[in-house]
């Protein structure tokens, strides 16, 4: 099918659609789960293939990556997301159609989603803080009904897709879309890491932790990473200089001992300069004791609990910086992909599933046992 739309200037505006089939399969749920039995609600449905609006592209999904917000969505907590729902924030694929106003993409381009959807015109957006936009929504989590990446074809505004560079696969790009972006924004955009710093990556076995280790090493930092004991060797293989079991009650004492041994070429006080935090819970105060004077903790989540007690003496006495972070900018995603194309950052893929195996895939992510890196789903 070829559709030509004439523009007002001398150049024809057009989009070419190669979607010959009329329907596609999609992973849909129409109710929330109360017991995390995802198999009860996840169903494969036949839906119409989307056609692009004037500013949109449609792409055939080759790979999509799981995120924890998929589980929040299926629970309907902390947000009651639109129903019926298609999840999937991180999707990569091949462009099959473009709207008449699309300028920078064409049919056949390899693209990946940038799931942070914002108004693009408010003061926050135009100052480079689109992640703080009051109208921000997360595509595939808050959008809908029936608008996400777990399907054969999906659509997004041109501004919410990024070209995949040569040498990066669809699977690697999907894995990196939100997770690498989040890690890059935490360390580079917010904490502004510098060569020679000592960086503690909490939960290094997770998706964000994997990228956090690599980004810190890219910037010439010394890295201590934590994980469960079965993942410590993998942290070292990924580039961490030291690996610590954070399930031990005294894990922070091991970190402190390492910090005292490391020559401080950029200061005279031993301690951690930057803590990459997304665990929260009972670890929080232990982390604060490890920071150097003027040190920074950058947090983007709290998988072990939100209600962390804080000993304020650590903060005011040492002049600590506590920074929050969510996602990042489209430009930061492109920066990360540049380094991926140079082989300096890689995506760690734990496992791959089909859409029909979605319940099993999400259960694995929820339990986390033996999980190292990202879980990928493919439509076929």
Predicted ranges, named:
Residues 48-65, 77-126, 147, 165-168:
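Glycine-rich beta-strand-centered segment in the early N-terminal region that forms part
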Residues 21-22, 330-380:
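C-terminal hydrophobic helical "lid"/dimerization subdomain
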